[in-house]
Amino acid sequence: MLSPKRTRFRKQHRGKMKGISYRGNHICFGKYALQALEPAWITSRQIEAGRRAMTRKARRGGKFWVRIFPDKPVTVRPAETRMGSGKGCPEYWVAVVKPGRILYEMGGVTKNIARRAFSIAASKMPIRTQFIILEIE
């Protein structure tokens, strides 16, 4: 699973996910990409599940880039615990994704293989996504 090696603080505020993604919303490395259409927290497990599904589908042909990284800790309180006594312990890591953000990129494969691989990866995601192709002017 992806997670930061070290952070300055163990716990974070939840924050707001309003607006669209102004960074990380263009294809940079590959020719095809999977773009988010809704805001969400995507866990490191979901990112890894999508990556594995894509690599299985494309076999040895293509190269992949994961464009999101889970850098926000999510704290969870133990079950059947009374209120108070502070915030819970960090349980897992999430990437904050806004609409327009590129999740994965792929290159070195045909359009059909890329579309199929991304559709499998998209089914692992908790949000609606779209398949986009790099347009060179």
UniProtKB/Swiss-Prot annotation:
GO BP annotations listed: mitochondrial translation
Gene3D superfamilies xref list: Ribosomal protein L10e/L16 (3.90.1170.10)
Compartment(s) of residence: Plastid
GO MF annotations in UniProt: rRNA binding; structural constituent of ribosome
Pfam families membership: Ribosomal_L16 (PF00252)
Disulfide cysteine pairs (residue numbers): none
SUPFAM superfamilies noted in UniProt: Ribosomal protein L16p/L10e
Keyword terms: Plastid, Ribonucleoprotein, Ribosomal protein
Chief location: plastid
CDD domains found in the cross-reference section: Ribosomal_L16_L10e (cd01433)
Gene Ontology CC: mitochondrial large ribosomal subunit; plastid
Family in the record: Belongs to the universal ribosomal protein uL16 family.
Quaternary structure annotation from Swiss-Prot or TrEMBL: Part of the 50S ribosomal subunit.
Name the UniProt record assigns to this protein: Large ribosomal subunit protein uL16c
Lineage of source species: Eukaryota, Viridiplantae, Streptophyta, Embryophyta, Tracheophyta
Gene from which the chain derives: rpl16
